[in-house]
Every structure is written in structure tokens, then in C-alpha cells.
Amino acid sequence: MTGTLYVVGTGPGSAKQMTPETAEAVAAAQEFYGYFPYLDRLNLRPDQIRVASDNREELDRAQVALTRAAAGVKVCMVSGGDPGVFAMAAAVCEAIDKGPAEWKSVELVITPGVTAMLAVAARIGAPLGHDFCAISLSDNLKPWEVITRRLRLAAEAGFVIALYNPISKARPWQLGEAFELLRSVLPASVPVIFGRAAGRPDERIAVMPLGEADANRADMATCVIIGSPETRIVERDGQPDLVYTPRFYAGASQ
């Protein structure tokens, strides 16, 4: 008899941003696998087992979790944000695809979570109100040339762009180079939003024009949203500015 593998996302980090469905999965699971900081967000019972590992061990982690679930254990794989957005759900599906036949019989439950770009957008207005895309700047699993091509094409097409994994100790130069590329395509006035820990006590949200965007404001936990030429900033007396992208496209019938 096989067990269950839950793949959950904790959201940006605040307990209020974790979905009830995820909370139910956490309550039901016996063993938990994930990156140290994500497991730290859970209040586990004494009878629940925690197995933490490094953030570059996704496939190994998925294989161990599937092995335990195939043995009849209720296992929970923990991601930050949404598990299907640059996170563990894809690694689990890859492991099932390439793994032994018994892994395909494991009950798989993936619970959606609040991903970083949605949390950051909600804190500043509605920058994702029209067409948008999400791009990871990490070149661990894809060439940098692919990333820059996608950035350029997305900017030329008028998408709002949410950047994940914008910078790390191993690649401190990439966000700056991405900004330079985007400045060659987009107006310097396009709003750029730096959002970190949205909804948590240590939240940091900053807005500036692309022409002044400084990559040093970001770290690996920052989500950077680059507006389109249609994105607007609304100044408000006594209230934070709003950033939004209109639902209609300029020149189209409204």
C-alpha cells in the first residue's frame, strides 16, 4: 500500500499567507522534506519528522520523498511560495517521470501557494493587471544566453516581467546585466519594484524608474517586477504610491 506525497508551498513566509489546503496537508503528513528556511516556517508536532537539506538538492530530495511515500508514509515536500513556480513540484514530477514504476502509483497532492510576485504586487497595487511573465535569472539549469533572449523578447512584446532568483553570491552580476539589457529596450521611466519578504515584519518594498534601478538592492529572496511602458504610478496624499498596469492596451477599444 502506497502512502501520499504532498507538495506544498508556504507562501512568502507569513503564516497568514499559507492556504488552508496547505495547512491541512501539513497536519496530515508524517515526514517533511525541504530547504532549511522553508521547514522553519512550519510549527510541527513532536511526532512529525523533519529532514532538511540544501536548496540545490531538489531532485535528490524528491527521490527520497517518493521512496518513503511508496513505502506507505505520508510525506510532505515543502517549498516557499507556490510549489509549482520555480520550486519543488517540477522536481517531483521529473522524478516520477524518470523513476521506478512504483513511484507512479504514489498518491500525489500538490497544493497551490501564494508566489512571490503575487505577494509583492498586492503590496504595491496591481502591476500584474495586464499580460505578464515570470523569468528566473538563475543559470544553474539553463544557459544565460537563453535567459537574456527571453528577457529581450518579453520586453519587446510589452510584458510586465517578474524576475525570480535575481542574484546570488555565485552570480552577483546577472541582475545588473539584465537591467542594462532592459534599458536598451524599455523607456527609462518604466517602474521597477523590488519586493522582499512581502507581508512579513521585515518586508522591504521599493519603487524606482528603470533608469535608476540598482541591482545592489536585491538579494536571492527579492522578487523584482519590471513594468511595461503602460505601467503607471499613482501618487496619493498620505498614502503609499500605487503602481498598476491598466487592463486595456493603448489604442485598443475599452
UniProtKB/Swiss-Prot annotation:
Assigned protein family: Belongs to the precorrin methyltransferase family.
Q: Which InterPro entries match?
A: 4pyrrol_Mease, 4pyrrol_Methylase_sf, 4pyrrole_Mease_sub1, 4pyrrole_Mease_sub2, Cbl_synth_CobJ/CibH_dom, Precorrin_MeTrfase
Record's keyword annotation contains Ribonucleoprotein? no
**Origin organism of this chain?**
Sinorhizobium sp
Biological process terms from the Gene Ontology for this record are: cobalamin biosynthetic process; methylation
Signal sequence interval, chain numbering: none
UniProt gene name: cobJ
**Key word Transcription regulation present:** no
Pathway involvement?
Cofactor biosynthesis; adenosylcobalamin biosynthesis; cob(II)yrinate a,c-diamide from precorrin-2 (aerobic route): step 3/10
**EC number annotated for this UniProt entry:** 2.1.1.131
**Which keywords annotate this record?**
Cobalamin biosynthesis, Methyltransferase, S-adenosyl-L-methionine, Transferase
Q: What name does UniProt use for this protein?
A: Precorrin-3B C(17)-methyltransferase
What this protein catalyses is: precorrin-3B + S-adenosyl-L-methionine = precorrin-4 + S-adenosyl-L-homocysteine + 3 H(+)
According to the lineage, what is the superkingdom? Bacteria
Q: Which GO terms describe its molecular function?
A: precorrin-3B C17-methyltransferase activity
